[in-house]
Structures are given as C-alpha cells and as structure tokens.
Regions:
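Eukaryotic intrinsically disordered, low-complexity regulatory linkers and tails enriched in Ser/Thr/Pro
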Residues: 1-96
Length: 96
C-alpha cells in the first residue's frame, strides 16, 4: 500500500518507521540533532515549499539499513488517519 504525503509524493506504507509532529517532537534536543545530522548527510527530502507540519521516517529502499526523512506540509494526525484507513481497507479486502 502507498501513502500520499503531499504534492506528488507517495511512499510505501511498509517502509514507514514513524510519523511525527514537527512542532512537538523538535522540542527535544535529540530530535533536533537527529534531523540536523540527516539533513547534512542528504537524507532529508522536503515534499513542498510550504511550512512543514510533520516528518516521516522511512527505510531507504536501496539500503534498508539507512533512513530517509520526508518533511510534509500535511499534519501528522491526517497522515496517521490515512494510514489507518489504508490498513482498514486492506484488511476488509483480504477477509473477503
């Protein structure tokens, strides 16, 4: 299954490690340091020029030991609802 995270960007749901609210999670210095290191190593993809509201940590398809961080203008709550509805629809289909 795929999750639309903004503009023309979709990611595989099985690659998602976590979806985080940018405002609340960056209060921690550890999170800020992690995002800063990811940015410096070229592992951050900004989905839009709009102000980001969330970030999604995913495994890299080419190297599963590496992580990719997507910055999205869509709130973490909306993304989590989308993931939930994708999962519910999938379960309904396989139960038939």
């Amino acid at each position: 299954m795929f999750l639309h995270i903004g503009v023309d960007t979709v990611i595989k749901t099985e690659d998602i490690i976590g979806i985080f609210d940018l405002d609340t999670s960056t209060v921690s210095k550890h999170t800020r340091k992690y995002l800063n290191m990811a940015q410096k190593s070229g592992r951050v993809i900004t989905v839009t020029d709009d102000l980001p509201k969330s970030f999604i940590v995913c495994t890299d398809e080419d190297d599963r030991s590496k992580k990719i961080i997507y910055l999205s203008q869509i709130s973490s709550q909306t993304l989590l609802k989308r993931v939930g509805s994708i999962g519910e629809n999938y379960l309904k289909r396989i139960k038939k």
